[in-house]
Swiss-Prot record:
Keyword set, alphabetical order: ATP-binding, Cytoplasm, Glycolysis, Kinase, Nucleotide-binding, Transferase
Protein name in the entry: Glucokinase
Pfam families linked: Glucokinase (PF02685)
UniProt subcellular location: Cytoplasm
Gene3D superfamilies: 3.30.420.40, 3.40.367.20
Substrates-to-products reaction catalysed: D-glucose + ATP = D-glucose 6-phosphate + ADP + H(+)
GO BP terms: glycolytic process
EC number in record: 2.7.1.2
SUPFAM superfamilies assigned to the protein according to its UniProt record, in alphabetical order: Actin-like ATPase domain
Protein encoded by which gene: glk
C-alpha cells in the first residue's frame, strides 16, 4: 500500500462494529478500499483508542479525519443508543493529534456517498437510467434506507459543492394505501399508538407486518426474527411472501412521497442492510408501481430513477466524499 501524502482517516461507526479506511482527497477514487478494516466496538474503550490502533496497524499517521456515526451529532458530541463509547470530537481529535476532525451522522454519509458512486455500485430498480453527473451540474437526490430503523435524507449539489440533508423522515406517520394496509395500521396502532413509517420499513418492521397479517388470519406465528421471514418467504411460505410483498410496496410508496417532499427528481438511492437481502423482491414487486402512483405527478415520477446501493462500504465512501467536499470549502465558511 502506498499512502497518500495527506491521508484522511475515515470511519463508519455503528452500534456493533467500527470500520476505518484512508482517503486521498486528490485522487479520482478517493476511498482507498484496500486500507479498510473492521473492529468490534467492545474490544476498545473509546473511539480514539480504536482509531489509534487502526493507524498503528497500517503504519500511517493522519492529521485529519471524517467519522460517520450511527446517531445524532450534537455540537461536539455524538450519541449512539446502547453504545459503550461517549464520542467527543474534541477529545478524539486531541488523542489522535488531528488538526481537523469532522463528526457526521451516518445517513449524511450515505447521502454524501452518492457523489462518488459509480454505475457498477448500484442496481437499477426502475425509472430512467442513471449516470453520475459532473459535480458542477446541479442535482437533487433522495436517500432512504431500512436497517434496524429507517433512515431518510438527501443530497443537494450546487456550484460544485455537496450539501447533505439530515432528516428524521423515518418517523413521519405511516400513510396506508389499501384496505389491507389500513387494517395493519389499526393493529399496529393498538400496540404502538402512533405508527411511523419506521414501524414497518426496517428489520423489525418486517416482523410487525408479519404479526399483523397473522392476527388478521387468526393465528399465532410464535417468536420471529426478520431473517426468519425472509427465509420462509424464500421457501414459499405464503404469509411470509405476502409480508415481503407488502414491505416492498409500502417502501415504494414512502420513497415516492420522499421525492415529492424533497424535490429529489434526479434519483432516489436505496441503502441500508435490508436492501441487498430483498433486492430481487424489490425488482419484481409493487415497489415501482406504488413509487410512481402519485396522481397528477405519476408521469413525472415514472422517470425518476430508483437505485439500490450495492457498494460494500457506502458509509466509508460517504465519509471520503465529505473529506473531498471539505477541501472545496472556501476559508472561513461554516457548514
Amino acid at each position: 500500500m502506498t499512502a497518500p501524502s495527506k491521508p484522511v482517516l475515515v470511519a463508519d461507526i455503528g452500534g456493533t462494529n467500527a470500520r476505518f479506511a484512508l482517503a486521498d482527497v486528490d485522487a479520482s477514487v478517493p476511498l482507498l478500499d484496500d486500507t479498510s478494516r473492521e473492529f468490534a466496538v467492545v474490544d476498545f474503550t473509546s473511539l480514539g483508542e480504536a482509531a489509534r490502533y487502526y493507524l498503528d496497524q497500517i503504519g500511517v499517521q493522519a492529521t485529519q479525519g471524517v467519522f460517520a456515526v450511527a446517531g445524532r451529532v450534537d455540537g461536539d458530541e455524538a450519541r449512539i443508543t446502547n453504545h459503550p463509547w461517549v464520542i467527543s470530537r474534541s477529545r478524539t481529535a486531541s488523542m489522535l493529534g488531528f488538526s481537523t476532525l469532522h463528526l457526521i451522522n451516518d445517513f449524511a454519509a450515505q447521502a454524501m456517498a452518492i457523489s462518488l458512486l459509480r454505475p457498477q455500485d448500484v442496481v437499477q430498480v426502475g425509472g430512467a437510467s442513471w449516470r453520475p453527473a459532473p459535480i458542477d451540474q446541479p442535482r437533487n437526490y433522495g436517500v432512504i434506507g431500512p436497517g434496524t430503523g429507517l433512515g431518510v435524507g438527501g443530497l443537494i449539489i450546487r456550484h460544485g459543492r455537496c450539501f447533505p440533508l439530515e432528516t428524521e423522515g423515518g418517523h413521519v406517520s405511516f400513510p396506508p394505501g389499501t384496505p389491507e394496509e389500513i387494517r395493519i395500521l389499526e393493529i399496529l396502532s393498538e400496540q404502538f399508538g402512533r405508527v411511523s413509517n419506521e414501524r414497518l420499513i426496517c428489520g423489525p418492521g418486517l416482523v410487525n407486518i408479519h404479526r399483523a397479517l397473522s392476527e388478521i388470519a387468526g393465528v399465532d406465528p410464535g417468536p420471529l426474527q426478520p431473517k426468519d421471514i425472509t427465509a420462509r418467504a424464500a421457501a414459499g411460505d405464503p404469509r411470509s411472501s405476502r409480508t415481503i410483498d407488502l414491505f416492498c410496496a409500502i417502501f415504494g410508496a414512502i420513497a415516492g412521497d420522499m421525492v415529492l417532499m424533497q424535490g429529489a427528481w434526479d434519483g432516489v438511492f436505496l441503502t441500508g442492510g435490508l436492501v441487498p437481502k430483498v433486492l430481487d423482491s424489490l425488482q419484481h414487486s409493487g415497489f415501482r408501481q406504488r413509487f410512481e402512483h402519485k396522481g397528477r405527478f405519476s408521469a413525472i415520477m415514472s422517470r425518476v430513477p430508483s437505485l439500490a446501493v450495492m457498494h460494500p462500504h457506502a458509509g466509508l465512501l460517504g465519509a471520503a466524499a465529505y473529506a473531498v467536499d471539505a477541501q472545496r470549502q472556501p476559508p472561513g465558511e461554516q457548514r
